[in-house]
């Protein structure tokens, strides 16, 4: 009975490894002229690293969008979401052919640094504005969830030239 369990265990392990490799193979690809997919990007905002997940048609570097004229959808998470990227991933994947998508992981969320500054609405929006500037995003549609709605409304008020549209999800 012990040999049988070991054999089953090996088969299950190999199957899991195979599933993992095949499931993640879309992340391992050669860089072409343009590509539809996902890129993980770190930018420096006010001396800290902020993580962004980019979905859509990316340029050869994978760092920016290939179709600059396409509407950019910026997604902001609810309070306490441990990984905004994972949280918004299914939605981003369903919309990435129609939009350039940026999932923002604000300081203290996901793979971004812990915030050095207080988490006030003004500070969070100043950081978001700096992130958009760093990415060269002049206008976007904000998609906000829960508490980010408060940040988003304040962002619209303080940076109206940057906001093309506003979507609140709860």
Identify the residue ranges that each predicted region occupies.
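Active-site acidic short loop of glycosyltransferases
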Residues: 47, 69, 97, 133-139, ...
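Sec-dependent signal peptide cleavage junction
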Residues: 22-36
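Active-site loop/oxyanion-hole signature of alpha/beta-hydrolase fold enzymes
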Residues: 103-141
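A conserved amphipathic alpha-helix that caps or lines the catalytic cleft of carbohydrate-
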Residues: 92, 132, 155-156
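Conserved HGGG/HGGXW glycine-rich cap/lid loop of the alpha/beta-hydrolase fold
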Residues: 51-111
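Hydrophobic core
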Residues: 16-22
């Amino acid at each position: 009975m012990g040999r049988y369990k070991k054999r089953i265990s090996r088969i299950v392990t190999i199957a899991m490894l195979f599933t993992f490799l095949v499931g993640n193979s879309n992340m391992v690809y050669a860089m072409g002229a343009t590509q539809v997919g996902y890129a993980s990007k770190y930018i420096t905002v006010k001396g800290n690293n902020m993580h962004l997940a980019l979905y859509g048609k990316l340029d050869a570097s994978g760092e920016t969008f290939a179709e600059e004229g396409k509407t950019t959808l910026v997604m902001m998470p609810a309070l306490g979401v441990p990984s905004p990227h994972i949280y918004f991933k299914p939605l981003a994947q369903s919309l990435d052919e129609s939009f350039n998508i940026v999932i923002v992981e604000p300081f203290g969320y996901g793979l971004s640094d812990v915030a050095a500054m207080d988490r006030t609405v003004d500070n969070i929006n100043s950081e978001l504005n700096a992130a958009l500037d760093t990415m060269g995003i002049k206008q976007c549609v904000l998609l906000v969830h829960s508490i980010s709605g408060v940040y988003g409304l304040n962002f619209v008020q303080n940076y109206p030239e940057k906001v093309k549209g506003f979507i609140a999800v709860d």
